[in-house]
From Swiss-Prot:
Organism: Caldicellulosiruptor bescii (strain ATCC BAA-1888 / DSM 6725 / KCTC 15123 / Z-1320)
Function summary: Catalyzes the isomerization of 5-dehydro-4-deoxy-D-glucuronate to 3-deoxy-D-glycero-2,5-hexodiulosonate.
Annotated metabolic or biological route of this protein: Glycan metabolism; pectin degradation; 2-dehydro-3-deoxy-D-gluconate from pectin: step 4/5
Family designation: Belongs to the KduI family.
Keyword Magnesium attached: no
HAMAP family: KduI (MF_00687)
Binding-site positions, Zn(2+): H194, H196, E201, H243
Enzyme class, broadest EC rank: isomerase
SUPFAM superfamilies: RmlC-like cupins
Name of this chain's protein: 4-deoxy-L-threo-5-hexosulose-uronate ketol-isomerase
Pfam families: KduI
GO molecular function: 4-deoxy-L-threo-5-hexosulose-uronate ketol-isomerase activity; zinc ion binding
NCBIfam families referenced in this protein's UniProt entry, alphabetically: PRK00924.1
């Protein structure tokens, strides 16, 4: 498990392009037959992936996080971005098609990932956060999520937001997770942008051709920087940073938040004229 440390915004604005990428961009997440994870000290979130092929993959024990098993004091949200697969949580099997999700509650001792077709495997993206109580493990069908259609073609941001894990749906201790799908010919996300001082966020971009990318904007509103993000890469966004992007074509991204609360209304909009 790779470890990333937190950073003060005054340090961030002095970083080079390569330093920004090293600290905040998560590359090479998906490897066949492996589980990969990054632990960020920003709200102690773990971002990871699993690509099971011939054999199922078992989430490692909790030794790296000071626990007897991985979910001893954690919860986890999982979304499949690949072909059909399954997750087994303490013996209970959940079949997941592409874009289906799963919330697994604290105290689940064993978590396994598998693919129906090893030659065309499932690709599980997951985010885990600390937890203080056990909520029920629950499958999330994208067709049954709360969906909100926003934006317009004239603003190049027509999109649908699907809420997977949130207070009015599948409940959790602190994890909030969902997916945003941009319509064809639409390329902007989260603009006008905002901040949420009491929550961090991770954006994971996918469903892009290999030669496409998203110009992801981050930093304080008056000290913005950018990261070139390609298919199936993620960006860690501290609470002091905006998180917005524009792509060379339309794309999909999974967003996940953790922190002090789960309130969507607890944000600070950033006026467009203040961006620099």
């Amino acid at each position: 498990m790779e470890v990333r440390f937190a950073m003060h915004p005054s340090q961030f604005k002095a970083l080079t392009t390569e330093q920004i990428r090293k600290e905040f961009l998560i590359e090479n997440l998906f490897e066949y037959g492996k589980i990969n994870m990054v632990y960020t000290h920003v709200d102690r979130v773990i971002v990871g992936s699993a690509v099971p092929t011939v054999e199922a993959l078992v989430l490692e024990d909790g030794s790296q996080i000071g626990a007897q098993y991985f979910l001893e004091r954690r919860e986890i949200g999982i979304i499949n971005i690949g072909s059909r697969g399954y997750v087994i949580a303490d013996g209970q099997k959940f079949e997941l098609d592409k874009k289906d999700g799963l919330y697994v509650g604290m105290s689940t001792k064993k978590l396994e990932f598998g693919s129906d077709d090893p030659s065309n495997p499932a690709k599980f993206y997951f985010v885990s956060t600390p937890a203080h109580k056990q909520y029920p493990t629950e499958k999330i069908d994208i067709k049954q999520t709360e969906a909100t259609h926003l934006g317009s073609l004239s603003e190049s941001n027509e999109r649908t937001i699907y809420k997977y894990i949130h207070p009015d749906g599948v409940k959790s201790c602190q994890l909030v997770m969902g997916m945003t799908i941009l319509e064809p010919n639409n390329v902007w996300n989260t603009m006008p942008c905002h901040l949420h001082d009491r929550r961090m966020e991770v954006y994971f971009y996918f469903d892009m051709p290999e030669d496409a990318f998203v110009l992801h904007l981050m930093g304080e509103p008056n000290e913005t920087r950018h990261i070139i993000v390609r298919n199936e890469q993620a960006v860690i966004s501290p609470s002091w940073s905006i998180h917005s992007g524009v792509g060379t074509k339309n794309y999909t991204f999974i967003w996940a938040m953790a922190g002090e609360n789960q309130s969507y209304s607890d944000i600070s909009p950033v006026p467009m004229k203040e961006l620099k």
